[in-house]
A protein has these predicted regions:
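Catalytic cores of enzymes
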Residues: 1-146
Length: 146
């Protein structure tokens, strides 16, 4: 958490690969587990991020509680409220090897100049050749600016 607090506000890209917890009973206490503690969704409201992309490579980081008015509460909302332009989030737990394959291709596509949404789509389609079942390659979605 301390390293995140120190480096995230001035980082253009944030990639977090860790364990996550979604709390449907209190989604603002959904969090990411770091070596020195939890970063909760409600903590993110105290940050000012200026990042092009935040990738939350952990189980169910895209999970959210839908409240009246179609308000979504969870880690996504916290990162977007803090200023992240876009998020790559997981919709379900995915195998580490398949996630690695998607992420390597995703960042390679971005580095070649592809927009974030197209980069993730291509990465998933390429990974589909190696891992046939959608469980492996379709876990990630892009939220925010594409």
């Amino acid at each position: 958490v301390q390293a995140f607090a120190q480096h995230a506000p001035q980082s253009g890209v944030i990639h977090i690969a860790t364990h996550a917890l979604f709390r449907a009973d209190n989604p603002l206490f959904s969090g990411l587990l770091f070596a020195d503690g939890w970063l909760f969704a409600h903590d993110l409201y105290d940050y000012t991020l200026d990042c092009y992309l935040a990738t939350l490579s952990a189980c169910r980081t895209g999970a959210a509680l839908v409240e009246p008015g179609d308000e979504l509460f969870g880690l996504m909302r916290g990162f977007l409220a803090a200023g992240a332009q876009s998020l790559a989030v997981s919709l379900w737990p995915a195998a580490d090897a398949a996630t690695l394959a998607v992420m390597v291709r995703f960042y390679s596509n971005i580095a070649s100049g592809m927009p974030r949404g197209a980069a993730l789509r291509r990465a998933q389609l390429e990974t589909r050749e190696e891992y046939k079942h959608p469980y492996h390659w379709a876990a990630f979605a892009l939220v925010g600016a594409r």
